[in-house]
From Swiss-Prot:
Upper lineage: Bacteria, Bacillati, Bacillota, Bacilli, Lactobacillales
A cellular component annotation (GO) from this entry: cytosolic small ribosomal subunit
Sorted UniProt keywords: Ribonucleoprotein, Ribosomal protein, RNA-binding, rRNA-binding
PROSITE patterns xrefs: KH_TYPE_2, RIBOSOMAL_S3
Family that this chain belongs to: Belongs to the universal ribosomal protein uS3 family.
Entry protein name: Small ribosomal subunit protein uS3
Signal peptide residue numbers: none
Protein species of origin: Lacticaseibacillus paracasei (strain ATCC 334 / BCRC 17002 / CCUG 31169 / CIP 107868 / KCTC 3260 / NRRL B-441)
Length: 220
């Protein structure tokens, strides 16, 4: 099962938390569609800002959005002008008060989405897919990853018949729930058609906290 299921969803509730943190009864469908609109709007608006993850929290009529990015300066802008403009646009989109928090990704080479985006952009620039994948894997391993696996699917190098190729280095234990596996899927729009890029990165293990032992032992 660990080989088939999405590694991110497989670990939610174990070592990962939800990207959407809110509760709704009758308004669940409306909030879900609003979340999708928010994510699509931010990803389109900040497509060059290396945005990896968007967390959404709701409290009454307020929406708190945390944007994880490797380029916080590009998102914030000069004097905070860009992020303020983004906040106003999201206020108009949702009809609610929006608060935006920018979270910097200090090691982008350990983020599966950013690594996949980098490979996809190189393929769009007609760089050989094997070279792009292997260079990305080397940078990730140098950044401190325990393992990485990449896969490209489609008309690779313009071949008439679509195929898939994958490369891996180190350990990527997909079925080990305590393993911090980051997974992402990206697309490269090439002249030969679309090529899918999948990336798995093992960032080590997250061990559960041990229960505290009682300081007072048995007595009378």
């Amino acid at each position: 099962m660990g080989q088939k299921i999405n590694p991110t969803g497989f670990r939610v509730g174990v070592i990962r938390d939800w990207d959407a943190k809110w509760y709704a009864d009758k308004d669940f469908a409306a909030f879900l569609h609003e979340d999708i609109e928010i994510r699509n709007f931010i990803n389109k608006k900040l497509q060059d800002a290396s945005v990896s993850r968007i967390e959404i929290e709701r409290a009454a009529k307020r929406v708190n959005i945390s944007i994880h990015t490797a380029k916080p300066g590009m998102v914030i802008g000069k004097g905070g002008s860009e992020v303020e403009n983004l906040r106003k646009q999201l206020n108009k989109l949702t009809g609610r008060q929006v608060h935006i928090n920018i979270v910097e990704i200090k090691k982008p080479d350990l983020d599966a989405k950013l690594v996949g985006e980098n490979i996809a952009r190189q393929l769009e620039q007609r760089i050989a897919f094997r070279r792009a994948m292997r260079q990305a894997m080397q940078r990730t391993m140098r950044a401190g990853a325990k393992g990485i696996k990449t896969q490209a699917s489609g008309r690779l190098n313009g071949a008439d018949i679509a195929r898939r190729e994958h490369y891996n280095e180190g350990l990527v234990p997909l079925h080990t729930l305590r393993a911090d596996i980051d997974y992402a899927w990206e697309e490269a729009a090439t002249t030969y058609g679309r090529i899918g890029i999948k990336t798995w990165i093992n960032r080590g293990e997250i061990l559960p906290e041990k229960p505290k032992q009682n300081s007072v032992k048995g007595g009378k």
